[in-house]
Amino acid sequence: MESALPSILTLVIIAEFIIGNLSNGFIVLINYIDWVSKRELSSVDKLLIILAISRIGLIWEILVSWFLALHYLAIFVSGTGLRIMIFSWIVSNHFSLWLATILSIFYLLKIASFSSPAFLYLKWRVNKVILMILLGSLVFLFLNLIQINIHIKDWLDRYEGNTTWNFSMSDFVTFSVSVKFTMTMFSLTPFTVALISFSLLIFSLQKHLQKMQLNYKGHREPRTKVHTNALKIVISFLLLYASFFLCILISWISELYQNTAIYMLCETIGLFYPSSHSFLLILGNPKLRQAFLLVAAKVWAKR
């Protein structure tokens, strides 16, 4: 069963890769068509485009690193190639996490209702808040790249001094653990911010939903259904985001203890987030949902 596990998970990875490219590509395409026709895009549409592009990059990086790890090819990559591969992975992962976090803050400020003066101040300046957070996240990216570059330089110096297979393998595992630990630590900040934002948004939606149900008791108020669906989507978003962060954390621990099966399983589950969450974004966005249903109807009609 253990020998069959890599083959099974590889098939799952490829399926997630295809789904992720289709869903994120769909978001980019529909918003691009809308931008060409209207000559303008809303703030949320711009966020969705950049998020979808970063996720496409992340999905490709995960697929490449999967096959490199599967066949132990990463240790044969040159210093420049290794830097390009790891830096691309870090950049795509950074923007995927931070843009999802920024999207959660955007939804919180746009949808939630709180009487706090601080919240109202941020709500009135939502575009500036989003821009400042995005620019601030670049500081984390810069520090992350510096730290990772130090790990790469240290490993290359040791690798050039001893090229035996056993040394290369054991030292590369140590290097990989250091890289994964650094990524986990830098992922903690956007995850914490997103967790707080989603929790506040869920609390606000739940509170508002209860009020609406009391006011329209015995009636099927359309707005109640809209808020219920929004609540379900937000909770699903939170669960997927949390599972992705936990996969990063557990994959680091499993690599530390050299548990290959758990590591591979976490990588597979981790790819489910950037692949599947885009479908939630499509279903939660009226324009994207309408376009998706139209495409689905045309495809179904041709069968």
Curated annotation (Swiss-Prot):
Location of the protein in the cell: Membrane
Mode of membrane association: Multi-pass membrane protein
Transmembrane segments: 8-28, 56-76, 86-106, 129-149, 185-205, 233-253, 262-282
Cytoplasmic topological domain: 29-55, 107-128, 206-232, 283-303
Species lineage: Eukaryota, Metazoa, Chordata, Craniata, Vertebrata
Organism name: Pongo pygmaeus
Family indicated by similarity: Belongs to the G-protein coupled receptor T2R family.
Gene3D superfamilies: Rhodopsin 7-helix transmembrane proteins (1.20.1070.10)
Record's protein name: Taste receptor type 2 member 13
Organism domain of life: Eukaryota
Additional remark text: Most taste cells may be activated by a limited number of bitter compounds; individual taste cells can discriminate among bitter stimuli.
Cited Pfam families: TAS2R (PF05296)
Parts of the chain on the Extracellular side: 1-7, 77-85, 150-184, 254-261
Annotated Gene Ontology cellular component terms: plasma membrane
Gene Ontology molecular function: bitter taste receptor activity; G protein-coupled receptor activity
Functional note: Receptor that may play a role in the perception of bitterness and is gustducin-linked. May play a role in sensing the chemical composition of the gastrointestinal content. The activity of this receptor may stimulate alpha gustducin, mediate PLC-beta-2 activation and lead to the gating of TRPM5.
Glycosylated residues (UniProt): 162, 166
Keywords associated with the record: G-protein coupled receptor, Glycoprotein, Membrane, Receptor, Sensory transduction, Taste, Transducer, Transmembrane, Transmembrane helix
